[in-house]
Amino acid sequence: MAEEGAILKVTKDLRAAVSAILQGYGDGQGPVTDTSAELHRLCGCLELLLQFDQKEQKSFLGPRKDYWDFLCTALRRQRGNMEPIHFVRSQDKLKTPLGKGRAFIRFCLARGQLAEALQLCLLNSELTREWYGPRSPLLCPERQEDILDSLYALNGVAFELDLQQPDLDGAWPMFSESRCSSSTQTQGRRPRKNKDAPKKIPAAYGGPENVQIEDSHTSQAICLQDAPSGQQLAGLPRSQQQRHLPFFLEKKGESSRKHRYPQSMWEPEGKELQLDQEERAPWIEIFLGNSTPSTQGQGKGAMGTQKEVIGMEAEVTGVLLVAEGQRTTEGTHKKEAEWSHVQRLLMPSPRGAVEGAVSGSRQGSGGSSILGEPWVLQGHATKEDSTVENPQVQTEVTLVARREEQAEVSLQDEIKSLRLGLRKAEEQAQRQEQLLREQEGELQALREQLSRCQEERAELQAQLEQKQQEAERRDAMYQEELGGQRDLVQAMKRRVLELIQEKDRLWQRLQHLSSMAPECCVACSKIFGRFSRRYPCRLCGGLLCHACSMDYKKRDRCCPPCAQGREAQVT
């Protein structure tokens, strides 16, 4: 169990390191450099994988061999790309196999060849078994496939590394920064802030440059991070709402890009907000009118980005409605107080009381408008011939008009900042759409390659079937020839037996002749002298004298027994 846990930990750590690289630097977010903490973690996991359960092999009078020697041997046998090997060997400052292996890993990462090189090295399973023990993940087909899939995912990430590192024999290059933070490390943790240090807000967020806010403002800004999206600005004063609104929208846009919410959480696009009166918040209608066609014009491939833009618009609308309601309530209270003061000033004049009643009725109908005409000016426009005798009333009217103009200017600034945020969201949507089109092109190319591979497979399958049929025909023909050869062998065996039997008969006859006395004639038993002629019989080989060979029925050189036997056969 412990060994299995160690193997799983090696592969799990490698997948986690690859996931961290993809999360921090994938999708064109920037290249991986030597200062990246994720690179240090990935290189360590790769080295641990290549050294896990490696068999000890030593060269003659040399140092212990490491995974660098395994990579060199495997690539040389597979006749793969030897460019990384030549590059590492050209580095004279690297003396140990460990440093050369690290340089090989960094070069393959920078060139996008790590997964391909490792796959070539693992094709020869016998060589892999010679270098690694049975517990190595490189010998398990399932884990090997998982590792290669993870490494192939790194081909889409750019690595800008310094390949001329002379100190790889000692350790990997150190790092100093990280782009992705673990959720377990940052969950429930907030950055510490000095109570005496004021917070600075740049001019791009709707306020003047380097404006210092007091501690109460800082605490309110911190509380906004934990408040719901529709109530984040409700607890701030009006001036701080105007400052923090663009900054809040930008933060919400970033959070919406980081977290993919389902479509059911957003309000449907295309619905216009119907207010109670026509002149209430007209700038919201302009904002929605400008944003709706831009988001609807995106292609089908950017549907996810459109949902983000739609959700951000809905959140902006909710925040603006809350802010608008607060401004309307505050404006209504202020105007009621001012109007009561004006009425007290105009109490001696009955004409002023009538004008106050008329203007008060108009105030009730148009008090909810933010960008409408000032209610005091509307009251005085009904009667051109009416004049205000008290100069203090004119001063109050002028102050109210100036306040309305200032509110209108601040709202226009907010509209500009909102349009800027919407423009950024549209640019992001366009970039996402372009990236999606590129991915669709790559997918189409891969599909075409797959179709070609399938056609080649069909052709090879047909050729294989044809070869199998030819092999079957040849097998049948060879069986027939083998049967004929077997018959021939049987015939040859029978002939050999016949020849052996004939040889035995001849040998027995020869033995019979040798047993006879060679000093007398076979026919007349005449003893041969030193000068007697001897004639062998042509049938049995016996010796005959001259008289027997010439006189016996004129048969030359044939003994009487053989001559009688021949006559018997003829008759």
Swiss-Prot record:
Subunit annotation: Forms homodimers (via coiled coil domain). Interacts with RAB7A. Forms a ternary complex with RAB7A and LAMP2; the interaction with RAB7A is mediated by RUFY4 (via RUN and coiled coil domains). Interacts with GTP-, but not GDP-bound ARL8A and ARL8B. Interacts with dynactin/DCTN1 and the dynein intermediate chain DYNC1I1/2.
Residue ranges, annotated region (Disordered): 174-207
InterPro entries found in the cross-reference section: RUFY4, Run_dom, Run_dom_sf, Znf_FYVE-rel, Znf_FYVE_PHD, Znf_RING/FYVE/PHD
Residues given in the record as Zn(2+) 1 binding sites: 521, 524, 545, 548
Domain of life: Eukaryota
Induction comment: Up-regulated by IL4/interleukin-4 in monocyte-derived dendritic cells.
Coiled-coil stretches: 408-481
Protein name per the record: RUN and FYVE domain-containing protein 4
Localization in the cell: Cytoplasmic vesicle, Autophagosome; Lysosome
Keywords tagged on the record: Autophagy, Coiled coil, Cytoplasmic vesicle, Lysosome, Metal-binding, Zinc, Zinc-finger
Function in brief: ARL8 effector that promotes the coupling of endolysosomes to dynein-dynactin for retrograde transport along microtubules. Acts by binding both GTP-bound ARL8 and dynein-dynactin. In nonneuronal cells, promotes concentration of endolysosomes in the juxtanuclear area. In hippocampal neurons, drives retrograde transport of endolysosomes from the axon to the soma. Positive regulator of macroautophagy in dendritic cells. Increases autophagic flux, probably by stimulating both autophagosome formation and facilitating tethering with lysosomes.
Residue span(s) of domain RUN: 33-166
High-level lineage: Eukaryota, Metazoa, Chordata, Craniata, Vertebrata
Any GO molecular function: zinc ion binding
Key word Chloroplast present: no
Organism: Homo sapiens
GO cellular component: autophagosome; endolysosome
Domain notes: The RUN domain and the FYVE-type zinc finger are essential for its function in the positive regulation of macroautophagy.
Zinc finger (FYVE-type): 474-567
Compositionally biased spans, kind Polar residues: 178-188
Positions of disulphide bridges: none
